[in-house]
């Protein structure tokens, strides 16, 4: 049975939630494999709108939903999100939801450190969500992390807390802050532990069991390839690997099981926070894209920066992540533009580049080379077949897939699950 891995092929916010929701309705299991509660997903099912930050999108449809070991978990944010969804009528229990017992925890001290660093950085800040994601990953790599399984052994946590607090106390002192209140931290963990542990298990084992039974598994990526800690616009990146290869290491299944890689691509480009953005439009056109696309973050509410489609960046993302096909989203936002542009290359100090350079100084200086196309006056909103699309919109889609050297598998024409043009079904072998 075919599996599917969904990743964002830009800077996140590509519309993954709707696509994952559509795929999740046909999957037997949905797995989050990286990131934390810093990446928002908005799902629209009928008249109901669900906003998720941590839980896999499959939870809304009752599909087995799993948080893998590659995620960093804020247990208090988890509880709040579950309570919000159950209030909307979503049933969540140990049968349809599981957390990897080796998943690292985000603690209050991580949120503290995140905020202190951003505040101290001033104009040079990265633009994190301030939710402790980065510091939690640092402690994981530094072998200081407290993990979900540790919640069952809080009385044996002294040595781990010694290492963790020694590290954070030194950092906090540098910011003029008092040491970590260990007693308060232990008490908070003791209170939340039973809630989290009811869902904890070796999820690699459960995934292996459902895989052997022929289940369709959907691996749900967060953010986007251009925010990958290795391949993104460093240092303006997230703290995890967002490429498709992480689906294996972040879930406990081998790379051969990750299946069809579906890259989610917005028909234009957006970015939240600081960092290079070659096609950014700081004019009326950029404002029009933002207003029509409702470009505000699900988690932070921050206004997104907007610009024309960058084929160079998306081609690079697709190559790095081994994308099999893309889902092109929010095409309807371009409806009514007399002309539309696509970035096909860059100029940098007299040279033409067909890739995005690695150094921050070069990234900041590249100038986009545009190809201009006629726009379309008709609407693409709600289209469910090629026959519903204006001819020029079809030409735009064809040009996008030519330039990114990756075929279009489906086109999304509204937030509604049914408003999708299917070219190739990712779940079909």
Curated annotation (Swiss-Prot):
Print the keywords alphabetically: Cytoplasm, GTP-binding, Ligase, Magnesium, Metal-binding, Nucleotide-binding, Purine biosynthesis
The cofactor remark states:
Binds 1 Mg(2+) ion per subunit.
Q: Where are the transmembrane segments?
A: none
Q: Which reaction does it catalyse?
A: IMP + L-aspartate + GTP = N(6)-(1,2-dicarboxyethyl)-AMP + GDP + phosphate + 2 H(+)
GO cellular component term, pick one: cytoplasm
Q: Name one Pfam family in it.
A: Adenylsucc_synt
Q: Which GO terms describe its molecular function?
A: adenylosuccinate synthase activity; GTP binding; magnesium ion binding
A GO biological process of this protein is: IMP metabolic process
* Active-site residue list: 13, 41
- Give cofactor(s), names only: Mg(2+)
Pathway assignment: Purine metabolism; AMP biosynthesis via de novo pathway; AMP from IMP: step 1/2
Positions of Mg(2+) binding = 13, 40
Q: Does the keyword Ribonucleoprotein apply?
A: no
Q: Where substrate is bound, by residue?
A: 298-304
**Statement: the UniProt record of this protein carries the keyword Magnesium:** yes
Q: Give the Enzyme Commission number.
A: 6.3.4.4
Broadest EC class assigned to this enzyme: ligase
Provide the residue positions that the database annotates as binding IMP.
13-16, 38-41, 129, 143, 223, 238, 302
Where, per UniProt, does this protein localize?
Cytoplasm
Binding positions (GTP): 12-18, 40-42, 304, 330-332, 412-414
Listed under subunit, the entry gives: Homodimer.
Which protein family is named in the record?
Answer: Belongs to the adenylosuccinate synthetase family.
HAMAP family from the UniProt entry: Adenylosucc_synth
Instruction: Report the function annotation for this chain.
Output: Plays an important role in the de novo pathway of purine nucleotide biosynthesis. Catalyzes the first committed step in the biosynthesis of AMP from IMP.
Protein name in UniProt: Adenylosuccinate synthetase
The organism of origin for this protein? Novosphingobium aromaticivorans (strain ATCC 700278 / DSM 12444 / CCUG 56034 / CIP 105152 / NBRC 16084 / F199)
């Amino acid at each position: 049975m075919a599996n599917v891995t969904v990743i964002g092929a830009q800077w996140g916010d590509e519309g993954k939630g709707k696509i994952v929701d559509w795929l999740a309705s046909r999957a037997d299991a949905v797995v989050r494999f990286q990131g934390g509660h810093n990446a928002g997903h908005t799902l629209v099912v009928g008249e109901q709108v669900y906003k998720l930050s941590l839980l896999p999108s499959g939870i809304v449809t009752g599909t087995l939903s799993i948080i893998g070991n590659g995620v960093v978990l804020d247990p208090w944010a988890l509880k709040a999100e579950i309570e919000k969804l159950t209030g909307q009528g979503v049933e969540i229990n140990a049968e349809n939801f599981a957390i990897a017992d080796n998943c690292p925890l985000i603690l209050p001290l991580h949120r503290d450190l995140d905020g202190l660093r951003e505040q101290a950085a001033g104009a040079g800040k990265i633009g994190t969500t301030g939710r402790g994601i980065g510091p939690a990953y640092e402690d994981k790599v530094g072998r200081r992390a407290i993990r979900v399984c540790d919640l069952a052994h809080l009385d044996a946590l002294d040595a781990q807390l010694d290492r963790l607090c020694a590290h954070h106390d030194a950092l906090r002192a540098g910011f003029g802050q008092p040491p970590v209140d260990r007693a308060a931290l232990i008490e908070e963990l003791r209170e939340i532990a039973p809630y989290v542990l009811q869902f904890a298990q070796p999820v690699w084992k459960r995934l292996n069991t459902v895989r052997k039974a022929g289940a369709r598994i959907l691996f749900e990526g967060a953010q986007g390839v251009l925010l990958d800690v290795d391949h993104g616009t460093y240092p303006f990146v997230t703290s995890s690997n967002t490429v498709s290869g992480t689906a294996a290491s972040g879930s406990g299944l081998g790379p051969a099981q990750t299946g069809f890689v579906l890259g989610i691509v917005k028909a234009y480009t957006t970015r939240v926070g600081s960092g290079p953005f070659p096609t950014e439009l700081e004019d009326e056109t950029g404002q029009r894209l933002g207003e029509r696309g409702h470009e505000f973050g699900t988690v932070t509410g921050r206004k997104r920066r907007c610009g024309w489609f960058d084929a160079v960046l998306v081609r690079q993302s697709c190559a790095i992540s081994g994308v099999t096909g893309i889902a092109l989203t929010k095409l309807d936002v371009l409806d009514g533009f007399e002309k539309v542009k696509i970035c096909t290359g860059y100029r940098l100090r007299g040279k033409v580049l067909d890739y995005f350079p690695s150094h921050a100084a070069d990234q900041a200086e590249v100038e986009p080379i545009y190809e201009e196309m006629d726009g379309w006056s008709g609407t693409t909103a709600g289209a469910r077949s090629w026959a519903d699309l204006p001819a020029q919109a079809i030409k735009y889609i064809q040009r996008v897939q030519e330039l990114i050297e990756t075929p279009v598998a489906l086109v999304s024409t509204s937030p509604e699950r049914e408003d999708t043009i299917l070219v190739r079904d990712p779940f079909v072998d």
